[in-house]
């Protein structure tokens, strides 16, 4: 179901301490919070943003459909989506 560039996966492991394997496991085990259209469809037509929960923090995983597979492009933590979906930083 998922595919990715192994070089990018190694870079994510080194720089962000997360892997596409872990992301796929999280998605398959119910950790997917939302799927959004990429806000810049002109530059990234058809690309989606998968919002996932990693240890209580929202991560954004840009992805695109390739046939019957989903290509994971990168992953990064997002304060904006953590606040929106997980309520971190709420004073109430």
Predicted regions and their residues:
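Ribonuclease/tRNase effector modules and their secretory precursors
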Residues: 1-92
